[in-house]
Curated annotation (Swiss-Prot):
Substrate-recognition component of the SCF (SKP1-CUL1-F-box protein)-type E3 ubiquitin ligase complex. The gene is FBXW2. WD repeats lie at residues 146-183, 185-221, 224-265, 276-314. Keywords: Acetylation, Repeat, Ubl conjugation pathway, WD repeat. Residues 54-101 form the F-box domain. This is F-box/WD repeat-containing protein 2. The modification N6-acetyllysine is found at residue 298. It comes from Bos taurus (Bovine). It holds the Pfam family F-box-like. Directly interacts with SKP1 and CUL1. SUPFAM superfamilies: F-box domain (SSF81383), WD40 repeat-like (SSF50978).
Amino acid sequence: MERKDFETWLDNISVTFLSLTDLQKNETLDHLISLSGAVQLRHLSNNLETLLKRDFLKLLPLELSFYLLKWLDPQTLLTCCLVSKQWNKVISACTEVWQTACKSLGWQIDDSVQDALHWKKVYLKAILRMKQLEDHEAFETSSLIGHSARVYALYYKDGLLCTGSDDLSAKLWDVSTGQCVYGIQTHTCAAVKFDEQKLVTGSFDNTVACWEWSSGARTQHFRGHTGAVFSVDYNDELDILVSGSADFTVKVWALSAGTCLNTLTGHTEWVTKVVLQKCKVKSLLHSPGDYILLSADKYEIKIWPIGREINCKCLKTLSVSEDRSICLQPRLHFDGKYIVCSSALGLYQWDFASYDILRVIKTPEIANLALLGFGDIFALLFDNRYLYILDLRTESLISRWPLPEYRKSKRGSSFLAGEASWLNGLDGHNDTGLVFATSMPDHSIHLVLWKEHG
């Protein structure tokens, strides 16, 4: 049949076919199929798949495809990547879905990076790290050996760990190598804090001292407490040192001169923690940039003015029970915006702007967890047997790590958290270095460290 005659015939057949009922159309198709050979059936098979199984992700505009993909959970997205090369190409090009997937795991996101493939790789790395946390495979342990008596004072900063001991020495360790950088003779150490040049120690001999790392010389001696000094903090900009003692007082000292500027009274228990920190919010009593002095005992947290006024009054007292029936666990977190402390009732978070309790986080499956670190996404907690990671968004424990029988100080001075930036969200780079350190009965230091990505 000539092409022109065929086209005329096909037009007539089409008009007739359209006039048939659905049943008649089906019978016509069945008859035509029965008359078809292999070439026609193959052609029919290829075209039917395209007509009946339309690839909407391929046919839709890219903007609409991205919009639909945003409704899928990350695991489904990964499954969809296996459907075809085209699906993998489209899904792997959607920056927003992979950034959202990373955020769902508590990952920090730099929105300025718009490379979708980069974020997909970050997500795959993230789920591997989260799986390691769930399977107790994210950490490894190490020990520091060098002291000959109990170690009751620890302080960590920028990869360096300072340990103060009853053997009348303080040592500075490089955590990454396990090597002792400095070792100097001191008094007994109940609290330590250091920087590149100096070490400040609070002692069971009721004094505070300042030492020079390079020479080991004592450059200042602060006398005035009548009980052991359990906590120290200082600020070079203010030229102020503060100390908390078993004599129930907080003392404010001139760091360079060594003179006592003020004695703050009001505590009725050992003062186990003092903190000097800049305020980051406008509060009822402070403005952003103001320095804040906090002190804590086993029942109360007190907020003080920093000044030289004699007999100055406490600005605010925080507690979890008015009748003192509930004790606060040692360790206090204050980042300028929130105050966080643990108790038998749970983890208490106060808003520093209003001093109101924002929330109480309870872990009913495990009671009496002590606080080590607190961030935007995660909190680090522990008890006598395990180290725990708490997801603050869901208030659920997502990981635990076994601990040996360590020496646990009631004041909280013999254990600490290491690097803290990951508590605000992992980013693929900040899950390195020290996680936790504690002193042991054999006078060594037990370290828990992030394991390198496998």
